[in-house]
């Protein structure tokens, strides 16, 4: 379905929620809103395939409609278990339907949980947060990353894809302008862009790239590398 969530003028702005209205159009929304989203997915599969060990688990925190796990299932060993976590029950329902429709052979467990409260991880060789940490309240992010590090298998990888803010205000403003131009090229009009920005204002709170790297290193992760960068979007991988 085509994303028309913000197509009509709203009487008043409300906070963005991953409800059924968003879930139904999410796949279109994310492809049109995140530069090189499908390439990011392909890159994450390559990276995960390097670190996902047989008979361990891959965690997808903020699994949404299951796109990442579906992509992973085609390349990863069938003995790698998948655990998808999302706070939205509607997302998890869509995720399960998509996993079944795509014939995913790995064992998949789906859980509804608020990452602001932490997460329980078992036998994990790969943990993915694709456009997820930015929705966790800043107060709880470092604690969540530390918890992931503490529970992961040694040698495991964390893959973090985030919207970020620029290190300096001048380029940050330019990058935001370029991003809005990108959305216009993908057929979002100015009203849609403005209304979504207002809805996300207190929900999606990006950090600087340097802040995300520091948070990973403070938790104990090493060999932190940037594998993707497009203006105000970035992908990081780090090893325990």
Language-model segment annotations:
Residues 36-54:
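Conserved alpha-helix/loop element of class I SAM-dependent methyltransferases that forms part
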Residues 128:
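A conserved beta-strand element that flanks and buttresses the S-adenosyl-L-methionine
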Residues 142-154:
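A short glycine-rich, Lys/Arg-flanked "PGG" loop and its adjoining helix->strand segment in the class I
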């Amino acid at each position: 379905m085509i994303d028309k969530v913000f197509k009509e003028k709203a009487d008043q702005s409300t906070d963005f929620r991953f409800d059924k209205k968003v879930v139904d159009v999410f796949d279109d929304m994310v492809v049109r809103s995140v530069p090189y989203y499908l390439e990011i997915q392909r890159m994450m599969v390559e990276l995960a395939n390097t670190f996902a060990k047989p008979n361990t688990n891959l965690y997808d925190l903020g699994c949404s409609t299951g796109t990442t796990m579906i992509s992973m299932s085609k390349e990863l060993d069938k003995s790698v278990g998948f655990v998808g976590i999302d706070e939205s029950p509607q997302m998890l329902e869509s995720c399960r339907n998509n996993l079944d429709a795509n014939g995913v052979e790995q064992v998949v467990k789906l859980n509804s949980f608020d990452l602001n409260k932490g997460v329980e991880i078992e036998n994990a060789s790969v943990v993915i947060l694709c456009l997820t940490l930015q929705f966790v309240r800043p107060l709880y992010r470092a604690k969540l990353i530390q918890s992931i590090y503490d529970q992961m298998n040694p040698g495991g990888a964390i893959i973090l894809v985030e919207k970020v803010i620029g290190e300096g205000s001048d380029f940050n403003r330019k990058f935001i302008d370029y991003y809005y131009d990108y959305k216009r090229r993908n057929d979002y009009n100015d009203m849609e862009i403005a209304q979504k920005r207002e809805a996300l204002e207190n929900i999606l709170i990006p950090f600087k790239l340097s802040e995300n790297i520091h948070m990973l290193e403070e938790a104990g992760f090493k060999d932190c590398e940037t594998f993707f960068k497009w203006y105000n979007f970035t992908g990081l991988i780090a090893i325990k």
